[in-house]
């Protein structure tokens, strides 16, 4: 066995192990709610795992993803063989097609420099086209095939607002929670990246002039999350405290790296959607729930762009400062004409 074959087999085994563990685990973690008497996901986290694995391994993750979802579907859902095949196609085809198109448009390195390059294309194709493609294929499958009543609502049998929330759960999973799996999995696969992540994102928090600010910021975030996710009901605090979280994360853009901000934002959103008894107090309709999901998705996009804009401005500022220092050094020397 040559080295290339060995590396491919090694990557396949690692990707398969990740899928077999992370896909069922993410399905278990996925927050849910009741809309019009039917159970609906608020964020379908297996899509986040799929995206993270694709971004890590590329086309070599296709077979592990198919096997991981096949095993998960067999374990959780009782269907006929044809229904299993149709369900697997609906879950994965749109993602594979969108990633293939991105590779054609951006080249072989389309998975690199996240999130520094081609933000708009990645958000459009992976954050919106993939979820819409998954739901359109499921609606078409529900029209052509019969599925059990327990899952028929996911194939277009639910009300309009139910379907809207269902689509938003996929968009939210792609845009908010993908990095929540991407960074930890990358650190598990490559311990060197874990050291890099510590040095770039975590260590400066404790050994920096803004360490007091970060400590107070984390305490405030934890307090607000504890209040919103507490097991009690209060119409006074409910969702009215939610804007404070947006303000906190906006303030942190200039002091934390995007990798750490995205992890903290995903963890905060997951807690809010999972322990939502107080956070969603007074939300009695699918329309209100749809609005809340829209706000979370919109802020995730804004957070990405604001972080990117700040990072770019810092790069430009360092470039200008370096140019100024170089100009000052040259200004200390007499001109060649004067010397001659």
Language-model segments: which ranges?
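Short helix-perturbing small/polar motifs within transmembrane alpha-helices
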Residues: 2-41, 50-148, 178-190, 203-241, ...
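Transmembrane helix-loop junctions at the membrane interface of multipass transporters and ion channels
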Residues: 144-151, 274-286
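Short aromatic-rich membrane-water interface segments that cap or initiate transmembrane helices
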Residues: 157-172
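Cytosolic signal-transmission helices at domain junctions
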Residues: 193-198, 311-322
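Active/binding-pocket-proximal capping segment
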Residues: 240-244, 266-272
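Conserved nucleotide-binding and Mg2+-coordinating catalytic segments in signaling enzymes
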Residues: 320-340
